[in-house]
């Protein structure tokens, strides 16, 4: 009794908000984590987890502060930190709920003979695309799936179509992969919501028996998606879809898996329209080239109108959607890029001075074949 002993009365309390803030700074960084989705792949006839999912954890600091306060003024016992567990959307322990059961479509393309830079970009893009999951009734975006095309991801400089000409830029060759995805989605009968054909016919896309008109160009001039030319398709089902892709040094393969849609696809093409004659050869002077340089930077080719028609029916035979895929391939001429000292000396100039014959060469064109 303070009155009897002559002491001042007092009470002891904790500032709970301040305690919660202190505990958050002390413990949260070591406990909190976001959930991580499983990375999945296809193993013969079912989905498997390639990288396991991880539950999310969030420390409840307000509740922890209350428990610490109770312990401090009570039994002084240990306190178990309360936390909320958040499950990932793609849970390794429940892959069946995704509803992916069937191969819907396969696309392929051949890039054998590509220069090293182009082959590198194809293989990097195929690896980034592999394992992409498309939610029910969502839209697949090729460029969102592979992300920003830059050196940090392993992309290098290679030949690209830039406007009305062919030049070099980082990521040249990535269209080989977007073309292959397009073919898989086309054959699967999926609704294609964004598609851009190439300006010129590219021989790689017509290897292995593929006809012209089944290629897909992409463009990513900036990190702003509003500037992109993308390839997109829709998942029309109530289940998830999986895009699987790989490149083996010669070919790109893309498989699209999902629920069995029962679609029947009718494809009619190619239907050829007008032809456009090759353009005259052209010489371009590049002051950045080393002296004595003459490089052919574009090969001549005719222009051609090409159209494919696709009709997709449901399992009852009712028409779901139909579309024509029209491409106008522009003609091109041989383009020779030369250093300033070689101006006028490329094959684009028919009046160029030819080098003299060696002194010991017969001038009648004779000699030994072989």
Per-segment meaning from a language model:
Residues 1-370:
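Well-ordered beta-sheet/strand-loop patches within structured domains
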């Amino acid at each position: 009794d303070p009155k009897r002993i002559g002491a001042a009365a007092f009470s002891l309390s904790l500032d709970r908000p301040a305690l919660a803030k202190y505990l958050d700074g002390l413990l949260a960084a070591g406990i909190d984590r976001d959930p991580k989705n499983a990375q999945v792949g296809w193993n013969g006839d079912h989905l498997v987890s390639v990288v396991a999912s991880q539950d999310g954890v969030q420390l409840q600091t307000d509740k922890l502060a209350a428990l610490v306060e109770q312990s401090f003024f009570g039994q002084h016992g240990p306190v178990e930190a309360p936390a909320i567990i958040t499950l990932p959307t793609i849970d390794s322990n429940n892959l069946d709920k995704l509803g992916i059961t069937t191969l819907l479509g396969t696309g392929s393309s051949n890039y054998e003979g590509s220069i090293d830079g182009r082959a590198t970009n194809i293989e990097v893009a195929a690896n980034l695309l592999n394992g992409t999951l498309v939610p029910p009734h969502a839209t697949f975006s090729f460029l969102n799936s592979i992300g920003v095309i830059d050196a940090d991801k392993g992309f290098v400089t290679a030949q690209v179509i830039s406007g009305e000409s062919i030049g070099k830029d980082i990521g040249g060759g990535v269209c080989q992969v977007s073309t292959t995805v397009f073919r898989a989605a086309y054959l699967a009968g999926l609704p294609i919501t964004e598609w851009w054909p190439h300006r010129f016919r590219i021989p790689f896309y017509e290897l292995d028996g593929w006809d012209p008109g089944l290629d897909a160009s992409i463009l990513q001039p900036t990190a702003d998606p509003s500037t992109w030319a993308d390839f997109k398709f829709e998942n029309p089902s109530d289940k998830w879809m999986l895009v699987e892709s790989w490149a083996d040094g010669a070919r790109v393969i893309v498989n699209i898996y999902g629920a069995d849609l029962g679609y029947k696809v009718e494809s009619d093409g190619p239907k050829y329209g007008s032809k456009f004659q090759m353009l005259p050869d052209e010489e371009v002077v590049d002051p950045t080239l080393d002296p004595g340089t003459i490089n052919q930077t574009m090969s001549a080719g005719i222009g051609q109108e090409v159209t494919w028609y696709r009709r997709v029916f449901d399992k009852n035979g009712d028409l779901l959607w139909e579309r024509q895929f029209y491409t106008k391939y522009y003609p091109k001429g041989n383009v020779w890029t030369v250093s300033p000292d070689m101006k006028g000396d490329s094959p684009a100039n028919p009046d160029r001075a030819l080098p003299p014959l060696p002194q010991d060469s017969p001038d009648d064109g004779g000699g030994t074949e072989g």
